[in-house]
Amino acid sequence: MLKFYLENVFHLIFFAKLPEAYAVSDPIVNVMPIIPLFFFLLAFVWQASVSFR
């Protein structure tokens, strides 16, 4: 029982500080969903550069 309680306390403390610890990377996380669109557009740029062969 004590082990279960200590594990829960550890997880609460660890995950409570996690968002604050990663606050620096918040702007990067906001841009990340757009990155696959760049690869999609890159395919068209590549095909345009080889004249859509």
Curated annotation (Swiss-Prot):
InterPro entries assigned to the protein according to its UniProt record, in alphabetical order: PSII_PsbK, PSII_PsbK_sf
Domain of life: Eukaryota
Single GO cellular component term: chloroplast thylakoid membrane
Propeptide stretch(es), residue numbers: 1-16
One annotated GO biological process: photosynthesis
UniProt keyword list: Chloroplast, Membrane, Photosynthesis, Photosystem II, Plastid, Reaction center, Thylakoid, Transmembrane, Transmembrane helix
Main location: plastid
Membrane-related topology note: Single-pass membrane protein
Protein's cellular compartments: Plastid, Chloroplast thylakoid membrane
TM segment ranges: 28-48
Record flagged with keyword Phosphoprotein: no
Family from the record: Belongs to the PsbK family.
Subunit structure: PSII is composed of 1 copy each of membrane proteins PsbA, PsbB, PsbC, PsbD, PsbE, PsbF, PsbH, PsbI, PsbJ, PsbK, PsbL, PsbM, PsbT, PsbX, PsbY, PsbZ, Psb30/Ycf12, at least 3 peripheral proteins of the oxygen-evolving complex and a large number of cofactors. It forms dimeric complexes.
Main function: One of the components of the core complex of photosystem II (PSII). PSII is a light-driven water:plastoquinone oxidoreductase that uses light energy to abstract electrons from H(2)O, generating O(2) and a proton gradient subsequently used for ATP formation. It consists of a core antenna complex that captures photons, and an electron transfer chain that converts photonic excitation into a charge separation.
Database matches in PANTHER family: PHOTOSYSTEM II REACTION CENTER PROTEIN K, PTHR35325
Protein name: Photosystem II reaction center protein K
Species per Swiss-Prot/TrEMBL record: Huperzia lucidula
Gene: psbK
